[in-house]
């Protein structure tokens, strides 16, 4: 049986520096995720760090995106090999790794997604990702079709951005603006000049190493500015934010 994930088109688009517009999925529901998948976004983040997701909620969302052109990207709760292994086995190929501060942490993330000898991923011969053992070339194709995006969101991460971006197997650098703002002493104010300067610096250093950069920017003016600065993969909103804003606007229309 053929696996319709290989080759990984999202990974190829990033390597070609093609702009990829995405959206955040935080409602942890297959219906809302399916709606996002019909909208035409290039990629969707299914959030395992701040949203109430786990293996049991991720699988229905992956099923809901089966016919979608939007590439599912999972943000893992932490850079931990067993967690990453389990998410690989259920069918994720694109990973966003939060709070990466050093080259060694970036290398660990890459190794966690690769079978030996390139990495340390544990081997199961039958799981959802290989269609329960029916994809003949899964082991041969898997290592080279995994996308690793590492998230820089601390001063140490900024300081080590060159080493992180140069790490073999890292496909892109993603900025976490809220945590970065907090780390720089500007909690709740990612628009502060110090934070914006750091974001642009990260983009520039990623580009210097031939790596695409990305960010979450639910405000249109911010998203367009980051694209002008050279960001390649930008998430321009979230299902939770869209839902909250639209419902509030509807209520206000009739209640005020």
Swiss-Prot record:
GO biological process: D-glucarate catabolic process; galactarate catabolic process
PANTHER family recorded: 2-KETO-3-DEOXY-L-RHAMNONATE ALDOLASE (PTHR30502), 5-KETO-4-DEOXY-D-GLUCARATE ALDOLASE (PTHR30502:SF4)
Positions contributing to substrate binding: 151, 178-179
Cofactor(s) the record lists: Mg(2+)
Gene3D superfamilies linked: Phosphoenolpyruvate-binding domains
Keywords per UniProt: Lyase, Magnesium, Metal-binding
Name of the encoding gene: garL
E.C. number: 4.1.2.20
CC per GO annotation: cytoplasm
Family to which the UniProt record says this protein belongs: Belongs to the HpcH/HpaI aldolase family. KDGluc aldolase subfamily.
Site (Transition state stabilizer): 75
Pathways involved: Carbohydrate acid metabolism; galactarate degradation; D-glycerate from galactarate: step 2/3
Summary of the function given for this chain in its UniProt record: Catalyzes the reversible retro-aldol cleavage of both 5-keto-4-deoxy-D-glucarate and 2-keto-3-deoxy-D-glucarate to pyruvate and tartronic semialdehyde.
Cofactor binding notes: Binds 1 Mg(2+) ion per subunit.
HAMAP family, per database record: KDGluc_aldolase (MF_01291)
Quaternary data: Homohexamer; trimer of dimers.
Protein's name in the database: 5-keto-4-deoxy-D-glucarate aldolase
InterPro entries, alphabetized: Aldolase/citrate-lyase_domain (IPR005000), GarL (IPR017648), HpcH-HpaI_aldolase (IPR050251), Pyrv/PenolPyrv_kinase-like_dom (IPR015813), Pyrv_kinase-like_dom_sf (IPR040442)
Binding residue positions for Mg(2+): 153, 179
A Pfam match: HpcH_HpaI
């Amino acid at each position: 049986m053929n696996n319709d994930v290989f080759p990984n088109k999202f990974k190829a688009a990033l390597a070609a520096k093609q702009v990829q517009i995405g959206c955040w999925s935080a409602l942890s529901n297959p219906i809302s995720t399916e709606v996002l998948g019909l909208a035409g976004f290039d990629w969707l983040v299914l959030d395992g760090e701040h949203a109430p997701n786990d293996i049991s909620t991720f699988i229905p969302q992956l099923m809901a995106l089966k016919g979608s052109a939007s590439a599912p990207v999972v943000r893992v709760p932490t850079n931990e090999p067993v967690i990453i292994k389990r998410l690989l086995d259920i069918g994720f190929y694109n990973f966003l790794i939060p709070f990466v501060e050093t080259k060694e942490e970036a290398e660990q993330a890459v190794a966690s997604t690769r079978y030996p000898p390139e990495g340390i991923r544990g081997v199961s011969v039958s799981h959802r990702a290989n269609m329960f053992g029916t994809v003949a070339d899964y082991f041969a194709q898997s290592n080279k079709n995994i996308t690793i995006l590492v998230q820089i969101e601390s001063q140490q991460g900024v300081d080590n951005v060159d080493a992180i971006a140069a790490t073999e197997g890292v496909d892109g650098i993603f900025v976490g603006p809220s945590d970065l703002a907090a780390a720089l002493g500007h909690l709740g104010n990612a628009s502060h000049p110090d934070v914006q300067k750091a974001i642009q610096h990260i983009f520039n250093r990623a580009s210097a190493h031939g790596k695409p950069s990305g960010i979450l920017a639910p405000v249109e003016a911010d998203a367009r500015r980051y694209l002008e600065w050279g960001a390649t993969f930008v998430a321009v909103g979230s299902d939770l934010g869209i839902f909250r804003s639209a419902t509030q606007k509807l209520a206000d229309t009739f209640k005020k």
